[in-house]
Amino acid sequence: MKNIIRILFCSVLLVWATNIKADVQFGVGGQMGFVNTDGTETEGTAADTSDRSKSIEEFFVGADIFIENVFGNGFTVGVSYIPFDIEMGSGDRLDVDGSDAAENDNGTRTAAADLTDFYTIYGNVPIGSNGVYGLVGYHFATVAPSVSLNNSTYGNVDVNGYQIGLGKRDGNAKIELAYSDFEDIGISATGGNTNSVSADADALQLRVSFGF
């Protein structure tokens, strides 16, 4: 349902912008960069109520499709969608608990998380007359965790974020450097224990795109 709302919101924005004189472009983009994630897992078992924290930096390469309205003064409003998952990080650890069988939760635990269903609403604000512009954007995405716990699972959670950057347009081609910061998230396990995870992520990326 939230994905449908995102699509409808983006569509309404573009329809509104199209009613003003503008050049509508479809295109593809490619990006690469780094995503940094700081996460903390809080154990909720009787044998262990400790916190475990970890910071992970992942290099990523991706692609997107977009539609945008380019106005006569260079101001641009658009929507992009990344049809691939972006890995936020992964790791593992070996748990060795006490001898109490009721509280024993031994074994290797693995964890990973991806950003999926990634939409961005953005605007390009011209700076001068040489094609340079400021970039502002707002992200809509879903965090999909994959964690191995005995009889427990973590569900997906929706996350939003903002983006700022600088770019340069040359005809239908653009290159831009942007920083993204995502809101803090909290996920509680369901099933065998009451573990919870909190995380914060940000990203720095270089993107090249071409419109048709």
Predicted regions and their residues:
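Outer-membrane beta-barrel translocator domains and adjoining extracellular loop/strand segments
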Residues: 38-51, 87-100, 141-158, 185-196
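Short glycine/proline- and aromatic-enriched beta-strand/turn motifs that initiate or cap beta-hairpins
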Residues: 20-87, 140, 211
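Residues on the lipid-exposed face of transmembrane beta-strands in outer-membrane beta-barrel proteins
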Residues: 30, 61-69, 79, 121-127, ...
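Outer-membrane beta-barrel "beta-signal"
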Residues: 23-27, 34, 166-172, 199-212
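Residues that define the transmembrane beta-barrel architecture of outer-membrane proteins
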Residues: 53-63, 113-119, 153-162, 169-171, ...
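Transmembrane beta-strands of outer-membrane beta-barrel pores
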Residues: 30-38, 81-87, 117, 127-129, ...
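Cleavable N-terminal export/targeting peptides
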Residues: 1-25, 212
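Membrane-spanning beta-strand positions in outer-membrane beta-barrel proteins
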Residues: 25-27, 74-76, 120, 131-133, ...
